[in-house]
């Protein structure tokens, strides 16, 4: 059951109220989530997880939901949340106090911030509550040492780069004032005193040097993983200057798309589109000038019914139809699997695993597999490569009109070839940006003179892609 919250609607003016205008009624009520859980139990689910991808479920809300789930379901209930906005540790303790069967945690060096709370902290709470954990904490301590090294190795992908201070609950003694915070948190959870609970839990996290609550994530209402993914990708695209604008646009884009829950893949679709919209604004273009193919499919209805209906006028603007249109499986076409003649005539996807990778993540897999085949070929043909000479040709000046990249990304697919006649607004190329596919159209009618890029290559915003003769 994907936990999410209603967006913050703009405050209505007195004139709007007098005209009878109202903001939409709440969608994501306790009953909404319970009904979803009951539906899945009826379908044969063995367990229900309340999955809070954004870390936005506060302790008071889980204190309402957990007894409701436990009294209406016959199967175990699990709780999954993140610490990004500062609720995670307090919410997990609240869930434990109110009867949860299972909670999701992370091991110390990978815990806190955009991740789940540390199992070591939950272990201390459970010991104080007289709850036995079916976990070998000695093994956890050994694993944690290995994870420290692994996280160091992954530093390039670490959006936080803040390690908690070393701690082992089996061998280290807590200072009396910190131990008192644990007792205060338990008392606050039992009495449903959310303010005191959060104060105690955040003091515990601060003592161990876990990341502080991220206010930007709290306001934008996004999952921690979605946030770190967006940061990492914007860094790769040298576009970190639009991060704050993109984050602020997420609630707006999500509402326009029918309030989908921000969980994979819809979290990435909405996040990438918010980036597109921020780039549009930066380039003085209307929002939604550039939309990913996946966002079009979401708005069209191909990912299924959204919690609230999409405005037909918006659907027409984005997807070219006013009607919700489910995905037609009979029209599915597998990804092309070309022979790479330049790398020894091997196929791009050589086995079932690679074919599946192409089908699931075409925008990423194509570039990944091409580089893999190239590296393998170069490793076995070093002598031949050394003997080859390179014929350097003088670059021909551009005389026609040019289709440019509206954003940084990778060339996923070129849809035209030299000599093709194209019309204004025709799709000429697919650009992969933030793992989403974006159709790039020609602003001109004419004949394709030259393709200025290659599939699989990275381009910057404003890069020249295709030359068109008018």
Predicted features along the sequence, with ranges:
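Short, proline-centered helix/strand-breaking motifs
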Residues: 76, 358-363, 412, 439
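Catalytic alpha/beta core domains of metabolic enzymes, predominantly
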Residues: 53-284
